[in-house]
UniProtKB/Swiss-Prot annotation:
UniProt KW keywords: Glycosyltransferase, Metal-binding, Queuosine biosynthesis, Transferase, tRNA processing, Zinc
Catalytic activity: 7-aminomethyl-7-carbaguanine + guanosine(34) in tRNA = 7-aminomethyl-7-carbaguanosine(34) in tRNA + guanine
GO biological process, one term: queuosine biosynthetic process
Binding residues for Zn(2+): 310, 312, 315, 341
Protein name: Queuine tRNA-ribosyltransferase
Family: Belongs to the queuine tRNA-ribosyltransferase family.
Function field: Catalyzes the base-exchange of a guanine (G) residue with the queuine precursor 7-aminomethyl-7-deazaguanine (PreQ1) at position 34 (anticodon wobble position) in tRNAs with GU(N) anticodons (tRNA-Asp, -Asn, -His and -Tyr). Catalysis occurs through a double-displacement mechanism. The nucleophile active site attacks the C1' of nucleotide 34 to detach the guanine base from the RNA, forming a covalent enzyme-RNA intermediate. The proton acceptor active site deprotonates the incoming PreQ1, allowing a nucleophilic attack on the C1' of the ribose to form the product.
PANTHER family: QUEUINE TRNA-RIBOSYLTRANSFERASE
Naturally occurring in which organism (per UniProt): Synechocystis sp. (strain ATCC 27184 / PCC 6803 / Kazusa)
Organism taxonomic ancestry: Bacteria, Bacillati, Cyanobacteriota, Cyanophyceae, Synechococcales
Cofactor mode of binding and number, as noted: Binds 1 zinc ion per subunit.
Positions of disulphide bridges: none
Pathway: tRNA modification; tRNA-queuosine biosynthesis
Annotated residues for binding of substrate: 98-102, 152, 195, 222
Length: 374
């Protein structure tokens, strides 16, 4: 088994006295990540519509890219020849690549699952692709992100117990193969993923097995695949405290205000979600916990900033009326400006929670967001 790298450490700086929340610093070869922290998603080595310089201005520290999509286009060989994904996309900060498992398992009509891995047809050109734990790690080693994810089987949110039990057991066996295949433990941290669906005993069993492997970090997967918010919350509140306190904890695919606040309450450190850019591309702004449709006529003659408290380029430069005009005109700039703001908004939200944890006022300051979902 590859030895954990000294290049990756997690230091807890403060703990909330009324919850499991903690503020810390996750050190990587490309710099520190102050936690808790929201990570923007750059699926194809680009956060949609945003330049790396603009992304840095949002205070983003760590960015996620997608192994499955980059394998299909342009291919890991081209990215490796460029010097790795950081140089390829012009981003100098920490990066994480997911394993491609979630995307592969979403191709329900195009794939075949076996103990070796998943055989699927590329939705781009129809060619057969054999994605195994070894191949996923090989691709991620070539991409060169700081954090890489184990190849896992992500069962449907409402899958029956036998299906989830089998998927969870296979995820562990695949993790062991990922560890053996990992060629760059010195500069890439391999995180394991706790699966188990909505069955808390399976989550406990999976967490116990992963902890025994002493990995550099741990993720909770399978919580953004169609479950009700209350079920997601139940799983996170149960699972997060089981994970080692001296390692970073990552909740995959979650990025709403309440879900992040509740997860931080349980001890989660890192989040990723496509919400900021997806909403931006549909003319929706995230403003202090609310969703605003900038196409609405109410903004047509509103010359105030989108959010007077926000330091982002959009809010410091343009009015609601201008944004309304851009969205109504279907101008690309409108979608870009809203995406910039939305990314900044969710990063600021996790930054403000971090500061509240340092001040030990988290449960008071964010009580509104800590009510369990129904």
């Amino acid at each position: 088994m590859p030895l954990p790298s000294v290049n990756f450490t997690y230091q807890c700086q403060a703990r909330c006295s009324h919850s499991q929340a903690r503020a810390g610093i996750f050190q990587t070869p490309h710099g520190p990540v102050e936690t808790p922290r929201f990570m923007p998603v750059g699926t194809l080595a680009t956060v949609k519509g945003i330049t790396p310089a603009q992304l840095a201005d949002t205070q983003a520290q760590m960015v996620l890219a997608n192994t499955y999509h980059l394998h299909l286009q342009p291919g890991e060989k081209i990215i490796a020849a460029a010097g790795g994904v950081h140089k390829f996309m012009g981003w100098s900060g920490p990066m994480l690549t997911d394993s491609g498992g979630f995307q592969v398992f979403s191709l329900s009509q195009l794939r075949t699952i076996g103990e070796q891995g998943v055989l699927f047809r590329s939705p781009r050109d129809g060619r057969l692709i054999d994605m195994t734990p070894e191949n996923s790690i090989r691709i991620q080693n070539a991409l060169g992100a700081d954090v890489i994810m184990a190849f896992d089987e992500c069962p449907p949110g409402q899958g029956d117990r036998l299906m989830v039990e089998q998927a969870t057991a296979r995820t562990y066996r695949w993790l062991e193969r990922c560890i053996e295949a990992h060629q760059r433990p010195g500069d890439q941290a391999l995180f394991g993923i706790v699966q188990g669906g909505t069955y808390l005993d399976l989550r406990s069993q999976a967490a116990e097995q992963l902890i025994a492997l002493d990995l550099p970090g741990y993720a909770i997967g399978g919580v953004s695949v169609g479950e009700a918010p209350a079920l997601i919350d139940k799983v996170v509140q149960h699972t997060a405290p089981l994970l080692p306190a001296h390692k970073p904890r990552y909740l995959m695919g979650v990025g709403t205000y309440r879900e992040m606040a509740r997860a931080i309450f349980a001890g989660i450190d890192l989040f990723d979600c496509v919400i900021p850019t997806r909403f931006g591309r549909h003319g929706t702004a995230l403003v202090q916990g609310e969703r605003w449709n900038l196409k609405n006529a109410t903004f047509r003659e509103d010359h105030r900033p989108l959010d007077e408290t926000c330091p982002c380029y959009t809010c410091q430069t343009f009015s609601r009326a201008y944004l309304n005009h851009l969205i109504r005109s279907r101008e690309m700039l409108g979608y870009i400006l809203l995406s910039l703001h939305n990314i900044t908004e969710l990063i600021r939200f996790t930054q403000s929670i971090r500061q509240a944890i340092l001040n030990d006022t988290f449960t008071q300051d964010f009580a509104h967001w800590l009510t369990p979902p129904e």
